[in-house]
Amino acid sequence: MSDSNQGNNQQNYQQYSQNGNQQQGNNRYQGYQAYNAQAQPAGGYYQNYQGYSGYQQGGYQQYNPDAGYQQQYNPQGGYQQYNPQGGYQQQFNPQGGRGNYKNFNYNNNLQGYQAGFQPQSQGMSLNDFQKQQKQAAPKPKKTLKLVSSSGIKLANATKKVGTKPAESDKKEEEKSAETKEPTKEPTKVEEPVKKEEKPVQTEEKTEEKSELPKVEDLKISESTHNTNNANVTSADALIKEQEEEVDDEVVNDMFGGKDHVSLIFMGHVDAGKSTMGGNLLYLTGSVDKRTIEKYEREAKDAGRQGWYLSWVMDTNKEERNDGKTIEVGKAYFETEKRRYTILDAPGHKMYVSEMIGGASQADVGVLVISARKGEYETGFERGGQTREHALLAKTQGVNKMVVVVNKMDDPTVNWSKERYDQCVSNVSNFLRAIGYNIKTDVVFMPVSGYSGANLKDHVDPKECPWYTGPTLLEYLDTMNHVDRHINAPFMLPIAAKMKDLGTIVEGKIESGHIKKGQSTLLMPNKTAVEIQNIYNETENEVDMAMCGEQVKLRIKGVEEEDISPGFVLTSPKNPIKSVTKFVAQIAIVELKSIIAAGFSCVMHVHTAIEEVHIVKLLHKLEKGTNRKSKKPPAFAKKGMKVIAVLETEAPVCVETYQDYPQLGRFTLRDQGTTIAIGKIVKIAE
C-alpha cells in the first residue's frame, strides 16, 4: 500500500475519531486515537471498525456504556480485548479474518468490504448515518416479571407471532453492540443503552431475590384458583378425570349412603369425655354388654369402679391407673344414618399438643363441660382447658360445636336449670368472642355421660322437665352434611406412623380419594410411594377411601424412619407446597410479653409441629375494620392482629387459607400456652 493511501486512511480514521469525541464528550471512544498506524499494512482494519457495529462472525459480544467493550473480541478479525480505561491492551491479530456481514462479504486481511459495501464513515452525511443506525437498532427486550408462585407471566409485553425464542435471543445479543454509535446525541444514546443493560444483569437480580435481603421486596404470591390459567386448566383437567372415576353412586354403594363424620371430645380434665365416649359405643352396639361387664369387674378390683366406661376408650394401662387420657384415643361407631369416628382428646394441660393433632382431623367438636360444683369453675377459669380447647378447635377448623353440659345428675346439680343456664351463658360469651356463630354453629344440651341420659334416649321428664331439645345422637344424625371435596387433588396429612409388615401411615383424607395401587407423592421429601393396602376405621381392608375418612395406608417406596407426623401424602400432579417462609395474619390471644422480629415459638399446622420465628412485622390491623397500617409496627402484644413474615427451621407442607383452609391455619404456642392463632395468606417464592 502506498504512503499516500496510508495517509488518507490515517486522516479518515482521525477525523472519525474526532467526530466521535465531539459527540460523546471524548469519553467512550478515546481508545481509538491510540490506534497504531504502523500496523495498517498487515490488514486494512480502519474501514472495518469505522461502523462500530461488529461482525456476526467476530463482533463485540457486550458493550459497557461506561467505558468501551468489556468482553473479548473474536481473534479471527480484530482486537482481542479492549481496556475500559481507554485503548486496546493487545495488538490486532495479523491473520485477519474473512466472513460475511449482513450479506456483504469481507476480507479484512487484504481488502475492505466487497460487493459494493461502502464504509459507514465515508460517502454519507451525519444525518444519514444516524437514520441508518436508528433503523438497525434492536427494539428493547421484553422482561419477565414473576407475578405468581405457580407460574410466569409476561408483564407489559406481548409475544411476537412466529418468532423462535432461541433465535430471537441470539439476534438480540448480536445486535446489542450495533446501537452504540458515537455520533448520536447523549440524550438519544443513554435511554436505549439502559434498556439494553437489563437483560445483561438478570443473573445478578436473580441472586438478590434468592437471598431475600429485604422482606418488603419479597416476591410473594397469594394463591387463588384464578392465579395462573395454565394451572387452572391442569387442575380442571385432573378434576374432570377423577370425576369420571368417582361419583355419588360409587360412594352410596360402598357405604350405603352414609357419610362419615369425625368427632373430637374435648374439655377440661375429669369433665367426663372418655366415659361419655365409652357409653356412646355401648349404646350404639359397637361394644357389647359382655365387654362392658368385664371392664366393670376389672375396674372394681382396681378400686376404680366408676371408671369402667372410660376404659373402653382408655386402653393404656397408665391411663387406666391414673384416670387420665394421655394420647388421642380413637373409636368407631355407626348409626342408621351416619358413620362416626370418636377422637378422645386428653384434657390435661401437659398434653395439649396431642389435642391439637386430634382437632386437626375432626369435623365436629363435642365440648364436654362438667356442671358439678367446683369442677365447672376450675375448667372454665383462666388456666383451665375448657377455654383453650375451644379456641384450638376453632383454629384447627372445627366450625361446628356441640356443648354438652355433663354430670347433670350429680347431687350438687340434680338437673338444675339455673346451673345449666349459668354454664351456657358463660360459655356462649366466650365462643362468640373467638368466632363461633351461636345461632348456627353451636348447640347446647344437658346430659349424663355415666347414666347415658340424653345421649341416645331422652332424659326422664320427671327429672328434667325444662329440656325438650334433641339428644346428642339425634342432633348428630340430623345436622347439615359436612362439605367434602371427593374429586379434588388427593391430600392426607400423616398423623401417625408404624411398622407392621411394611410401612403404615395413619391420618384423615382432607381432599380427594385414594385407590389401592395408586401412586402418590410424599412431601416434603418428594418421594414417590405406592399405596399397597387401605384399611378403614374398623381395620378392614378396602379398595378405595374418600375425603373425610380416617384410614391407615400401607405404602411402598419409603422406610418408616424417614417419615414424620406432619408429612403429607399428596397427588403427584398437584402436590402440596413445601416452604420455609410465608406471610400470615396473626391474632395474639394470650401473651405476657410482646412479639417482635426474632421472636421464636412452636407452630402447630394440621398434624405438623415445627419451630418458627418472626422475620418481620409488616402491618397492624385495626380493630373492627382490619385496615392495614401504613407503617410496620415495632412490636405486637395481646389483643393485636398483625400481618407478619414467618420462617420455619425446616420445610413444612402448607397451603394458603383461601385455597385449603385445613392446611392454611395454624396455632402458635410458647411455654405450654397458646399465644396466637393465624392463617397463611401468602407463600414466599
UniProtKB/Swiss-Prot annotation:
Region (Charged) residue spans: 139-249
Record organism: Saccharomyces cerevisiae (strain ATCC 204508 / S288c) (Baker's yeast)
Protein name per the record: Eukaryotic peptide chain release factor GTP-binding subunit
Region described as G5: spans on this chain: 448-450
Quaternary state and interactors: Heterodimer of two subunits, one of which binds GTP. Interacts with polyadenylate-binding protein PAB1, and TPA1.
Start and end residues of each stretch annotated as G2: 323-327
Further comment found in the protein's record: [PSI+] is the prion form of SUP35. [PSI+] is the result of a conformational change of the cellular SUP35 protein that becomes self-propagating and infectious. This conformational change generates a form of SUP35 that assembles into amyloid fibrils. [PSI+]-aggregates sequester soluble SUP35, resulting in defects in faithful translation termination by read-through of translation termination codons. [PSI+] can be cured by GdnHCl and by deletion of the molecular chaperone HSP104, which is required for [PSI+] propagation.
Keywords (A to Z) from UniProt: Acetylation, Amyloid, Cytoplasm, GTP-binding, Hydrolase, Nucleotide-binding, Phosphoprotein, Prion, Protein biosynthesis, Repeat
Biased composition (Basic and acidic residues): 166-222
Residues covered by region (Prion domain (PrD)): 5-135
Residue positions, PTM Phosphoserine: 571
